[in-house]
Amino acid sequence: MGCFSSKHRNTESDIINGSVQSSIPTNQPENHVSRDVLKPQKPPSPQIPTTTQSNHHHQQESKPVNQQIEKKHVLTQPLKPIVFRETETILGKPFEEIRKLYTLGKELGRGQFGITYTCKENSTGNTYACKSILKRKLTRKQDIDDVKREIQIMQYLSGQENIVEIKGAYEDRQSIHLVMELCGGSELFDRIIAQGHYSEKAAAGVIRSVLNVVQICHFMGVIHRDLKPENFLLASTDENAMLKATDFGLSVFIEEGKVYRDIVGSAYYVAPEVLRRSYGKEIDIWSAGIILYILLCGVPPFWSETEKGIFNEIIKGEIDFDSQPWPSISESAKDLVRKLLTKDPKQRISAAQALEHPWIRGGEAPDKPIDSAVLSRMKQFRAMNKLKKLALKVIAESLSEEEIKGLKTMFANMDTDKSGTITYEELKNGLAKLGSKLTEAEVKQLMEAADVDGNGTIDYIEFISATMHRYRFDRDEHVFKAFQYFDKDNSGFITMDELESAMKEYGMGDEASIKEVIAEVDTDNDGRINYEEFCAMMRSGITLPQQGKILPVQ
């Protein structure tokens, strides 16, 4: 059973009675799983070791590293296909010849839209994975939108330890290329099978990583929509390798008040409210609950020979805690499974609450603080000169709603009293929810850095300014608009007077600050800032966090 997706409106009875068109190839059984991890027969027999069985030896076919499981959309009416001219761009930036930047290596896997390879960066020798998507296969506007959104979300979530890092997105005349961190380890279930046995404590460690991904996504305003074991890879072959979420092809930004109706996901892991076509971020919690159930007993809780049968079982919602090995599983573990698989999404536990559950907290929680994406961005912002901060504020004011969906949700999550500003306490609590362990002094430093106008709070635009820069600097049009804002007379230069005028408008225009900016940015020492100097300033200090810790992969 691969991913399924539907863009037409069906009733719950349509889905249960089997009138929804299947996206599964006719040469495969309806409940085919993309991995042979789960092939339960009636009665289901565990295909992975459970917490009470220690010697299982399964011969598994080798799994391509970083293989993306491609989604397929199901439509009742055929749409007129899009035909691309070779001169047309999808990503909105100039074509780049990928082979000038990277040397492509062996094929790792292939999906509906393209092929994933290993690749080596020519300038550094670092090794990555390259997912090449053929543009001629993107025959519908929805396909194009999905690819663009996947790139945007991966860039937005960049910097999280449990999420695969994207290096860059490139486009040539034939393909779009996503270059990302190469996970050299196996799939989650492959590691468990190879070990032969594991404990509840080990299962708690795994689900902690999964829930951490969910919590970060939700706090940052993203719904994953396709959580399953196949979409988690180990960063390396090391015993204590980090688990990484790899596929965001079905992910969307959370829109306040929106009810989602698309049927997406993978059959075993799909929440009942998805089948009812009315859902929100809680579907990710359900999927995490299914993963935990499988970790503890070896089979999914809702099983059938067919996809229609699986959906029937999900709607019924009867969970077996009586069969082996459940009598020997702790009550605390079963309690967490029940809370994650609560049928009513409004009553379902959140990721943050699940991470506080005694069964998870009772385990060996990692001592190492997580340097979250938000925190790393704010640290970079703190180190910037005043002109750069001001330029980012100008850019933030010009961004569209589409471009800042996730950040808007994150601001709302931090602004707990809904005042429209973030106080010191709200910033401290918000960063703590993202896993950061900062001292009072460090939080105060970040607060002072983000509070551009110095009024003691961070307003919406200041927050966007301090957090959006990490993944927006390849957008030349934003940088050019910011330059034009300062260059009032359109001379092609920012003069001392123009700089003073703009900085005073934002309460930053003391003489020392202006001289400091000119001295730092004006590299040709002519007393003014040209566009090239401005661009160099905007792009300085932008690095790919975490990359050096795991690359190159040998």
UniProtKB/Swiss-Prot annotation:
Membrane topology reported for the UniProt record: Lipid-anchor
Species this protein is from: Arabidopsis thaliana (Mouse-ear cress)
Lipidation positions, renumbered (N-myristoyl glycine): 2
Family annotation (SUPFAM superfamilies): EF-hand (SSF47473), Protein kinase-like (PK-like) (SSF56112)
Protein name listed in UniProt: Calcium-dependent protein kinase 15
Region annotation Autoinhibitory domain: where it falls in the sequence: 365-395
Free-text domain note: There are 3 contiguous domains conserved in the CDPK subfamily: a kinase domain, an autoinhibitory (junction) domain and a calmodulin-like domain. The autoinhibitory domain (365-395) inactivates kinase activity under calcium-free conditions.
Active site (UniProt): 226 (proton acceptor)
Upper taxonomic lineage: Eukaryota, Viridiplantae, Streptophyta, Embryophyta, Tracheophyta
Chain positions recorded as ATP binding sites: 108-116, 131
